[in-house]
Swiss-Prot record:
Superkingdom per UniProt: Bacteria
HAMAP family: Ribosomal_bL35 (MF_00514)
Example GO biological process: translation
Family from the record: Belongs to the bacterial ribosomal protein bL35 family.
Keyword Ribonucleoprotein in annotation: yes
Name by which UniProt lists this protein: Large ribosomal subunit protein bL35
UniProt keyword terms in alphabetical order: Ribonucleoprotein, Ribosomal protein
Keyword Cell membrane in record: no
Gene Ontology CC, one term: cytosolic large ribosomal subunit
Length: 65
């Protein structure tokens, strides 16, 4: 059986943890940041865990993570 291909776009967006979960960046922290509070921007700069309902799709896109 041939090797599975990794979707490079997903590999750049998600990182696997040691327990098999995936981490992602939060949205709304790219531009138009002037009116957002420092507290909100600090929160948006942290990583989030991919929801378990989406984790299976991410796992298919990154088979060797």
């Amino acid at each position: 059986m041939s090797k599975l291909k990794t979707r490079k776009s997903a590999a750049k967006r998600f990182k696997a943890t040691a327990t098999g979960k995936f981490m992602r960046r939060r949205a709304f922290h790219n531009h138009l940041l002037d009116h957002k509070s420092s507290k909100l921007k600090r929160h948006l700069s942290t990583k989030a865990v991919v929801d378990e309902r989406d984790a299976d799709n991410v796992r298919l896109m990154i088979p060797y993570a």
